[in-house]
Amino acid sequence: MESQRNILLIGLLFVSFLLWQQWQTDKNPQPVATESSVVASTVTDAHSADVPDADAALPEAVAASKELISVTTDQLTLKINPVGGDIVYSALVGHKLEQDKEEPFVLLQQTKDIYYISQSGLIGRNGIDSSTKGRAHFSSQSQAYTLADGQDTLEIPLTYVADNGVTYTKVFTLHRGKFDVGVEYRINNTSAEQLQVQMYGQIKHSIKKSESSMMMPTYRGAAFSTADTRYEKYSFEDMADKNLDKKTLGGWAAMLQHYFVSAWVPPANDQNTIFSSVSAGGLANIGFRGAVYDVAPGTQQTISAQFYVGPKDQEALSAISESLNLVVDYGFLWWLAIPIHWLLMFYQSFVGNWGVAIILITLTVRGMLYPLTKAQYTSMAKMRNLQPKLQDMKERFGDDRQKMGQAMMELYKKEKVNPMGGCLPILLQMPIFIALYWVLLESYELRHAPFMLWITDLSVQDPYYVLPLLMGVSMFLMQKMQPMAPTMDPMQQKMMQWMPVIFTVFFLWFPAGLVLYWLVGNLVAITQQKIIYAGLEKKGLK
C-alpha cells in the first residue's frame, strides 16, 4: 500500500520532469552541428553564394495580388509569383484556421507579422536565378488555374526565354487529394552553347517563436534529413549560430510548426547539399542545392523536385520520402506512440469519434494490464491483513527504523507478501500515459477533433475544466477505497491526501483527450477494484 502511493507520487514528479525537460529543450535548443558539417554564419558559403538571398528577393517577392497566379485544387489554394515562380501563399482548404469559422488555415504567407514562402530556381553558370543577376520573370497563359471536377492532375506551366534563345519552362504539378507539389524545369537548349545549371529549393521564414506552454510544448523551426541522419531539428537559434552545409544522397529540408510542415524533397538518387542561412533582415532559410546538369546544344533537360505544404500526415509524408514522416516527433517513446496512434486511427475508423476511440484505447490498455492489476490488489489485500502486525511493530520499535525495516522484511518473507507487488501496473501506465500525450500533441488528425457536448476539440484543454474536476473526484474515490497504512508517517499521509488536488491542478491544462483517458482509466480501475475485492473476500482476504 505504502509503496504504491510512493510510486504514484514518483510517477507524477516523473511526468512533470519530462514535460518540463521537453519544454526547455524546445524553447532553448542547443546547437547540434559539428565543425565538419557547418561554417560560421558570418562567412559566405561559396556553394550557396549564387542562391538568391532572402533580403535580395524581398522587394520583388511582395507583388500585388493581381500579378500573382492563383492555383486551386480540392486540398490547396496557392499563389505563385511570376517573378522567380515562388509559392508565396498556401491555404489548406480542408483545414480551418479556427474550429467555429470557415476561414482556411494559411501556411505560406506574406503579411506584416510573418514572411513565409517557398522559393526555387536555377543557379550555376547559366542559371536564370541568382543574387547578382536577379530572378527570371516568367509568363503564364492564365492568371488562375483550377482542378476541375473529374480531373486528377493540374499543371501550371510558366515560361521564360533567355537572351540566348534558350527556353525555360517551370511546371508546377498538383494532384487531387494531395498536398505535394511537383516542381519541374524543362530546358530546351536551342543555343550553340553548352549550358550548366543547378536547381535549388529553399523555404524562407521570418524568425518567430513557437506559441508553447509548459503543458502544450510545440516546436517552430527547421529540420532536415541526410543519408547519415534520418531526422534532426535545426532551430532558429542553431541557424543563427551556424550555417548548415551537408552533402548527401537524397535528403530533405523542412520548416515545422504545430501540426503542419513545409518541405523540399530533391531526387533521392542525386547528390544534393542541404543548407541553411539567416539573413541580416531576420529571415531564416533552409533548403537544398541539387546536382549540376550539363545541357548540350540542341538537347533538352528536365530537372525536378517535390515540395510538400500541408498537415503532418504520416502516410502522405512517407510516400514522398522514407523519413519525412519523422517530422511527427513522438520523442523518446516513439516506439510506443506509433502503435498507440495506429490503434487510435483503427478505432476511430469504426466508431467515427475520436473521444470514443480514446475510451476504447483506455479499455484496451486496462484489459491488457488486468492480470497485473489483479495481482496488485491481491498484494494490497494481503498487506492490509498485515496492518495489525505492522502497527504492533511500529509501537515496539518506535523510531528505530533499521530494526523496523528488518522486522518488516522478515514478516513479508514469512507471509509470502511482495511489498512491491502493487507497483508494476502503475509503472507500466506511465510510459503509455506519456506516449499518448505526445500522440495527442503531434497528430494533426486530433486537431479540432470533437467528442461530445462541450468537448469540441480533444487536442486542447477542457474550456470549462469539467473533465479535470471529474478526474480529481475519481482519484478521491479511489483513494477512499484504499485506506492509508497505519505505518505511513504523518507527512506522507498529508501528501497523499493532497494528491487528487495536485493531479487536478496539473490536468487543468492538459489536452482534453488525455484527461479523458485518465478519467476513464480511473473509472475502470474502480470497477475492477470492486470486482477483484469481491473475489478476494470469498477467499478470506479483505
From Swiss-Prot:
One of its GO terms (cellular component) is plasma membrane. GO terms for biological process: protein insertion into membrane; protein transport. CDD domains: 5TM_YidC_Alb3, EcYidC-like_peri. It is a multi-pass membrane protein. It is found in: Cell inner membrane. It comes from the Bacteria. It holds the Pfam family 60KD_IMP. One of its GO terms (molecular function) is membrane insertase activity. The chain crosses the membrane at residues 6-26, 326-346, 350-370, 421-441, 458-478, 501-521. Keywords: Cell inner membrane, Cell membrane, Chaperone, Membrane, Protein transport, Transmembrane, Transmembrane helix, Transport. Required for the insertion and/or proper folding and/or complex formation of integral membrane proteins into the membrane. Involved in integration of membrane proteins that insert both dependently and independently of the Sec translocase complex, as well as at least some lipoproteins. Aids folding of multispanning membrane proteins. HAMAP family: YidC_type1 (MF_01810). Belongs to the OXA1/ALB3/YidC family. Type 1 subfamily. Interacts with the Sec translocase complex via SecD. Specifically interacts with transmembrane segments of nascent integral membrane proteins during membrane integration. NCBIfam families: PRK01318.1-1 (NF002351), PRK01318.1-3 (NF002352), yidC_nterm (TIGR03593), yidC_oxa1_cterm (TIGR03592). This is Membrane protein insertase YidC. It comes from Shewanella loihica (strain ATCC BAA-1088 / PV-4).
